[in-house]
Amino acid sequence: MMAAGAALALALWLLMPPVGVGGAGPPPIQDGEFTFLLPAGRKQCFYQSAPANASLETEYQVIGGAGLDVDFTLESPQGVLLVSESRKADGVHTVEPTEAGDYKLCFDNSFSTISEKLVFFELIFDSLQDDEEVEGWAEAVEPEEMLDVKMEDIKESIETMRTRLERSIQMLTLLRAFEARDRNLQEGNLERVNFWSAVNVAVLLLVAVLQVCTLKRFFQDKRPVPT
């Protein structure tokens, strides 16, 4: 009964919405993803706030456009250039530990004068929890009930499951980006194949007509017929 009561209390705590504490700091930074169209000859920058002493992972892919490449730079809140890449199709970079402030991510398509690029990028922060949040749900269980339930094992299992689920979501997002890039590439190839196939058919028809006309001329008797 005590173990059942502990499990019920744990389930109720997990279903309850988080309650803010008076004077608490700003909400934690959330992971994010974004897909945008970068015009030819343009540069576009984004700013992302980051807490201190955390881990920031940046992943990007060019999923559309001729060449599938772009220039990428990443700057710290102090203006220090952390990453600089030229004509890359994708990249993964980790900043650890982070500084408190706004990180600057720039994508540059200035080298292209005609082709626009479809760019996907994702920002992943480490999932750090305050000690109060980690220990908060343990307080929902009476001390005597904790004797029958291995609270540390439960916390460890939940944390492992949450981490794996978050990583699974991130991997699915990247797979969607890969799929979008491959689909755009295949659609572009299909358009080129259809165009040149139509050109070849038109040339074949033209050659066939010319051959028929030429043969008909060979067999035409243009000599005058005596009367």
UniProtKB/Swiss-Prot annotation:
Record-level GO cellular component terms: endoplasmic reticulum membrane; endoplasmic reticulum-Golgi intermediate compartment membrane; Golgi apparatus; plasma membrane
Record's subcellular location: Cell membrane; Endoplasmic reticulum membrane; Golgi apparatus, cis-Golgi network membrane; Endoplasmic reticulum-Golgi intermediate compartment membrane
Domain GOLD: 43-125
UniProt short sequence motif COPII vesicle coat-binding, positions renumbered to this chain: 218-219
Any one Gene Ontology BP term: protein transport
Keyword annotations of the record: Cell membrane, Coiled coil, Endoplasmic reticulum, Golgi apparatus, Membrane, Protein transport, Signal, Transmembrane, Transmembrane helix, Transport
Signal peptide: 1-23
Transmembrane annotation, as ranges: 195-215
Coiled coil: 145-170
Family matches, as SMART domains: EMP24_GP25L
InterPro entries in the record: Emp24-like (IPR015720), GOLD_dom (IPR009038), GOLD_dom_sf (IPR036598)
Annotated membrane topology: Single-pass type I membrane protein
Job of this protein: Potential role in vesicular protein trafficking, mainly in the early secretory pathway. May act as a cargo receptor at the lumenal side for incorporation of secretory cargo molecules into transport vesicles and may be involved in vesicle coat formation at the cytoplasmic side. Plays a positive role in IL-33-mediated IL-8 and IL-6 production by interacting with interleukin-33 receptor IL1RL1. Plays also a role in the modulation of innate immune signaling through the cGAS-STING pathway by interacting with RNF26.
Protein family per UniProt: Belongs to the EMP24/GP25L family.
Xref: PANTHER family: TRANSMEMBRANE EMP24 DOMAIN-CONTAINING PROTEIN
Protein name stated in the entry: Transmembrane emp24 domain-containing protein 1
Biological source species: Pongo abelii (Sumatran orangutan)
